[in-house]
UniProtKB/Swiss-Prot annotation:
Belongs to the steroid 5-alpha reductase family. Polyprenal reductase subfamily. Keywords: Cell membrane, Membrane, NADP, Oxidoreductase, Transmembrane, Transmembrane helix. The lineage of its organism: Eukaryota, Viridiplantae, Streptophyta, Embryophyta, Tracheophyta. It comes from Oryza sativa subsp. japonica. This is Polyprenal reductase 2. PROSITE patterns: S5A_REDUCTASE. Plays a key role in early steps of protein N-linked glycosylation by being involved in the conversion of polyprenol into dolichol. Acts as a polyprenal reductase that mediates the reduction of polyprenal into dolichal in a NADP-dependent mechanism. Dolichols are required for the synthesis of dolichol-linked monosaccharides and the oligosaccharide precursor used for N-glycosylation. It is an enzyme of class 1 (oxidoreductase). It catalyses: a di-trans,poly-cis-dolichal + NADP(+) = a di-trans,poly-cis-polyprenal + NADPH + H(+). Pathway: Protein modification; protein glycosylation. GO terms for molecular function: polyprenal reductase activity; polyprenol reductase activity. Its EC number is 1.3.1.94.
Length: 353
């Protein structure tokens, strides 16, 4: 079911993710310098740089440093990503949850044995009836799966917003404006991708409610009564795939919390632009275990969503490529900055890169 104006949402999201991912993949490929490979890698490194990897070199002239500053923003603007993410995710979560509650409740399982007996008694037409009921049930599950996935996304952005304010102590370093805009795009497109299959029908539902409210008026509209148990019961009746995804998500989140606590403890003085080698937890194996945990988190979301919508796959592919590229850049920076940096560490994924 698709509302007018929304049928192109999924293709647009796929195109946006592909457009954001391809330059990263191209920069990672061994493209010869003669055809612009080195330039592409330098440009992408500059655009994606932040914090320690974007600071002007001490040998740079004052004019060069001033020019770089024009295209950068303070690294503490990371908070903007999560504010936007919370707003976008909350709006989508509340809208689709309300739509699912009003139109797709209760969520009940059909008895296969009852359907079989009924088909023998009534005849072959019952098979068509069963298929219709099956499609209806599948549609209900798809919408409630979306609510579940958006709940996980909401937990993620709320936690990251909290960590940005209370865990991380950002230095005076800066990040490139292109990376900043990419972050804003990401935290709008990610919840849209998770909800893309349900947005058209939810939008159609709300579009139908507005004229009804205008015609009838508030006094003649039925009172809205929300049963809290009906809000949660459909989520508890979802399949085992959703709960496996939730367990993966929770494991990745707990691991990332530990990694962020380690990183936050390295900079007790906010005004000092100084970096040290992080140690402990998986930092002893990889340079960016917090990025690895993020991959696990979004893999959990992918599993919990049912992994049926193409935009969610492109979202996950972007997360893999973007964080892998950033991890390699960070790893190379550590090697250049610290002579005693452990070269046995991988960038992000043990035994892979």
């Amino acid at each position: 079911m698709e509302s007018e104006g929304w049928p192109a949402l999924q293709p647009l999201l796929c195109f946006a993710w592909i457009a954001a991912t391809l330059p990263i993949i191209a920069a990672a490929l061994p493209i010869p310098t003669a055809v612009g490979g080195h330039l592409l890698r330098r440009l992408l490194s500059a655009f994606s740089s932040r914090g320690k990897t974007v600071r002007p070199s001490p040998a740079s002239s004052s004019g060069s440093s001033s020019s770089k500053a024009k295209f950068t923003v303070p690294q503490k603007y990371f908070m903007h990503f999560y504010v936007v993410g919370v707003l976008a995710t909350t709006i989508l979560l509340l809208a689709i949850w309300f739509y699912a509650y009003m139109k797709l409740t209760p969520l009940l399982l059909e008895s296969s044995s009852y359907s079989t007996i009924f088909s023998h008694l009534v005849g072959s037409n019952s098979f068509s009836f069963g298929r219709v009921r099956s499609r209806t049930m599948g549609h209900k599950y798809r919408v409630w799966r979306t609510v579940f996935a958006l709940l996980l996304m909401e937990v993620q952005v709320l936690r990251r917003l909290y960590e940005t304010e209370h865990v991380f102590h950002y230095s005076p370093a800066r990040m490139h404006i292109v990376g900043y805009l990419t972050g804003l795009f990401y935290y709008v497109a990610a919840p849209l991708s998770l909800a893309s299959s349900c947005i058209p029908e939810a939008a159609e539902y709300f579009q139908g409610q507005v004229p009804e409210f205008v015609v009838k008026g508030r006094a003649r509209m039925p009172d809205l009564v929300i049963d809290s148990s009906s809000l949660l019961q459909p989520l508890l009746k979802l399949g085992w795939t959703q709960w496996i995804g939730a367990v993966i998500f929770i494991w990745g989140s707990l691991h990332q919390i530990r990694c962020h606590a380690i990183l936050g403890s390295l900079r007790e003085h906010k005004d000092y632009d100084e970096y040290v080698i992080p140690c402990g937890d998986c930092f002893n194996r990889v340079s960016c275990p917090h990025y690895l945990a993020e991959l696990v988190i979004y893999f959990g979301m992918l599993v919990a969503s049912g992994a049926e919508d193409i935009p969610v796959w492109f979202l996950f592919i972007f997360v893999i490529t973007n964080l892998s590229f950033a991890a390699v850049e960070t790893y190379n920076w550590y090697l250049q900055k610290f002579e005693d940096y452990p070269r046995s560490r991988y960038a992000i994924i043990p035994f892979v890169c």
